């Protein structure tokens, strides 16, 4: 995604994440998962660690981490609690779409706020009759004048409560 950070920086970042996971996440995973509780405090800590801007370019307030470092972060988080990596990943997938394909004004409007955690990216992929099969989705966005009209059904939208 971006220029790789030096190995020493990778090691420091990964060590911080490992400490966070062992101290704040692993001890509460079973309880929160069993009670179907959204881990807001954990998400807030991911934001404080700068991880909601992990792959966003520094010019937009992000860390600008390499794809390699990002993959290592996701691997570590997923090993402790897969659900948390889903919130984080979905957010950064949306941020990557804006960073790569957005107009300059969209980048200015959204990327700083994504990086700070003020806004969260969400993904509306899963549908009742096809799951996450992109070839089978039925939801459509059709331009109608200056707007798009979206029609379809989704089973859930990752991060929708925070978008």
For the regions a protein language model found, what residue spans apply to each?
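Amphipathic, small/basic residue-rich leader segments at the start of a protein or domain
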Residues: 1-88, 105-116
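N-terminal glycine-rich flavin-associated loop
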Residues: 82-105, 131-134
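Short hydrophobic "helix-edge" motifs at membrane interfaces and signal-peptide entry regions
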Residues: 47-48, 93-94, 142-143
């Amino acid at each position: 995604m971006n220029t790789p950070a030096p190995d020493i920086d990778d090691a420091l970042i990964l060590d911080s994440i490992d400490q966070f996971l062992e101290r704040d996440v692993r001890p509460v995973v079973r309880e929160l998962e069993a009670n179907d509780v959204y881990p807001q405090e954990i998400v807030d800590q991911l934001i404080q660690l700068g991880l909601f801007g992990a792959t966003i370019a520094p010019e937009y307030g992000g860390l600008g981490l390499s794809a390699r470092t990002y993959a290592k972060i996701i691997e570590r988080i997923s090993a402790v609690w897969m659900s948390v990596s889903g919130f984080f990943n979905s957010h950064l997938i949306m941020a990557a779409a804006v960073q790569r394909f957005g107009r300059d004004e969209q980048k200015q409007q959204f990327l700083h706020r994504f990086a700070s955690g003020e806004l969260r990216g969400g993904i509306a992929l899963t549908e009742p009759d096809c799951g996450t099969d992109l070839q089978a989705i039925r939801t459509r966005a059709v331009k109608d004048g200056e707007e798009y009209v979206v029609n379809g059904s989704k089973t859930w939208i990752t991060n929708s409560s925070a978008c």
